[in-house]
């Protein structure tokens, strides 16, 4: 049996309102639990449109047929009008999710984090994280114990900025296996659970066709030599590609794969995890930098 952590990112108002309820129903039908990470502040995702001037981002949008994949309400959110507050508008849905699934913070403002966190000070990072955690805790009525950086925009500064919040784990980077981030010699931070597998929008196109994606990603899960962690998005697998995701759950079960919340991947003694660090890097299919796992020594 292969155990795969299932992470569900919720970036937008529509993803929360439409995608999450469908995913909750789908997961319930198949007896699967996952980790949901919510954006809870303003939905300004449409402001990413200016990135179309960048060739790699434009190619990604064309390759994934973004207009039909996400819908124009997502692609234009927060452009000609102020972005609506996601958490306030969907508190009931988020609360229901937290009743049945592990629930953590993705971002206060997904667009702002993805665009500006790379040059924010530690204080600015801490204030933004605190704002998101406070809002999410007010909605779900219990402490937030985990987080996942929006767009995997994380480095050593982000690791340090999250330390005051006493989280059980963070999932801020791409990598191969769980690790303890090294803050300084002799001091480690909150365990990291990296995403190890590509997302739909990173690979779909000339290399992998939509109709063969599930077969392809299942083979990657079975071949994963580390701790497999897979990310889906409420805006994609919860809306237009919900049937594809349901088919994935069936095929994965038949292949001996069991999905679980990320928190279930943590060992009883996190001190046994190897040391590592998060550095800025790039991966195929994703525009811009993102946090990547790198080995580190204790000295």
UniProtKB/Swiss-Prot annotation:
Domain annotation NodB homology: ranges: 2-260
EC category name: hydrolase
Pathway listed: Glycolipid biosynthesis; 4-amino-4-deoxy-alpha-L-arabinose undecaprenyl phosphate biosynthesis; 4-amino-4-deoxy-alpha-L-arabinose undecaprenyl phosphate from UDP-4-deoxy-4-formamido-beta-L-arabinose and undecaprenyl phosphate: step 2/2; Bacterial outer membrane biogenesis; lipopolysaccharide biosynthesis
Name of the protein this chain belongs to: Probable 4-deoxy-4-formamido-L-arabinose-phosphoundecaprenol deformylase ArnD
HAMAP family: ArnD (MF_01870)
One annotated GO biological process: 4-amino-4-deoxy-alpha-L-arabinopyranosyl undecaprenyl phosphate biosynthetic process
Catalytic reaction annotation: 4-deoxy-4-formamido-alpha-L-arabinopyranosyl di-trans,octa-cis-undecaprenyl phosphate + H2O = 4-amino-4-deoxy-alpha-L-arabinopyranosyl di-trans,octa-cis-undecaprenyl phosphate + formate
Native organism: Salmonella newport (strain SL254)
Cross-referenced NCBIfam families: PRK15394.1 (NF011923)
Recorded family membership: Belongs to the polysaccharide deacetylase family. ArnD deformylase subfamily.
EC number: 3.5.1.n3
Function of the molecule: Catalyzes the deformylation of 4-deoxy-4-formamido-L-arabinose-phosphoundecaprenol to 4-amino-4-deoxy-L-arabinose-phosphoundecaprenol. The modified arabinose is attached to lipid A and is required for resistance to polymyxin and cationic antimicrobial peptides.
């Amino acid at each position: 049996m292969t155990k795969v952590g299932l992470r569900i990112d919720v970036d937008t108002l529509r993803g929360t309102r439409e995608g999450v309820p469908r995913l909750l129903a789908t997961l319930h039908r198949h007896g699967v639990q996952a980790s949901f990470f919510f954006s809870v502040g303003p939905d300004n995702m449409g402001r990413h449109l200016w990135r179309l001037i960048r060739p790699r981002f434009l190619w990604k949008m064309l390759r994934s047929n973004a207009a039909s994949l996400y819908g124009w309400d997502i692609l234009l959110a927060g452009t000609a009008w102020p972005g609506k507050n996601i958490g306030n508008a969907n508190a009931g849905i988020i609360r229901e999710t937290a009743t049945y699934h592990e629930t953590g913070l993705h971002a206060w403002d997904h667009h702002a984090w993805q665009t500006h966190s790379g040059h924010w000070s530690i204080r600015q990072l801490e204030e933004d994280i605190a704002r998101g955690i406070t809002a999410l805790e007010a909605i779900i009525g219990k402490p937030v114990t985990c987080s996942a950086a929006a767009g995997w925009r994380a480095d050593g500064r982000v690791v340090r900025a999250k330390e005051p919040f006493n989280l059980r784990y963070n999932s801020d980077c791409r990598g191969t296996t769980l690790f303890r981030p090294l803050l300084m010699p002799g001091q480690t931070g909150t365990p990291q659970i990296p995403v190890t597998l590509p997302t739909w929008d990173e690979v779909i196109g000339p290399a992998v066709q939509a109709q063969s994606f599930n077969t392809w990603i299942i083979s990657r899960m079975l071949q994963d030599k580390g701790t497999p962690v897979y990310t889906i998005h409420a805006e994609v697998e919860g809306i237009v590609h919900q049937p594809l995701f349901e088919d994935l759950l069936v095929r994965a079960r038949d292949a001996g794969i069991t999905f679980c919340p990320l928190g279930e991947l943590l060992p009883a003694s996190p001190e046994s995890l190897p040391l590592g660090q998060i550095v800025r890097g790039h991966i195929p299919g994703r525009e811009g930098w993102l946090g990547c796992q790198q080995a580190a020594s204790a000295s």
